[in-house]
């Protein structure tokens, strides 16, 4: 088993896909699941490249005032990483991402971007990727086969309750 690498850094902003980005002491960018801008966090590195790393928050040292408890703490990273912020913050970040995409191509928008919603915060999905997880029961008497989400940043799976 490979040695786990942990890094501590301050997160700067949200980038496309729902990750936060920060800069490591050596100058490499870190794309981080489970963090919010301005938070000081410790991450477990899940992918290491020469110019960047990817990771998952393992500890929040300084918490953002925007942070809320996710509705589904066991699987939110796999299913909906935006659950750690209020819907108003999510919409604001998504509008900023759209504006930034236009700015990168030197396109000036005539108006500020507004994100419209039906107000439904949970139980909607844009994309679903499932797998299966097999295991034995606690008493080793029968095998189970459960529906599961893929765990972000790793090879594990998160069993969907009630399957």
Model-inferred region functions:
Residues 1-163:
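SAM-dependent transferase fold signal centered on methyltransferase-like domains
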């Amino acid at each position: 088993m490979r040695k786990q690498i942990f890094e501590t850094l301050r997160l700067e902003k949200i980038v496309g896909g729902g990750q936060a980005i920060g800069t490591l002491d050596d100058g490499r960018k870190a794309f981080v699941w489970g963090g919010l801008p301005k938070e000081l966090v410790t991450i477990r590195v899940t992918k290491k490249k020469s110019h960047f790393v990817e990771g998952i928050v393992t500890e929040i040292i300084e918490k953002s005032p925007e942070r809320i408890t996710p509705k589904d703490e066991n699987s939110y990273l796999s299913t909906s990483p935006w659950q750690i912020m209020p819907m108003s913050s999510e919409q604001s970040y998504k509008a900023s991402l759209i504006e930034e995409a236009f700015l990168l191509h030197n396109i000036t928008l005539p108006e500020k971007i507004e994100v419209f919603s039906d107000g439904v915060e949970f139980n909607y999905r844009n994309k679903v990727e499932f797998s299966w997880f097999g295991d034995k029961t606690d008493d080793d008497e029968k095998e189970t086969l459960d529906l599961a989400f893929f765990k972000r940043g790793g090879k594990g799976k998160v069993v969907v309750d009630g399957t």
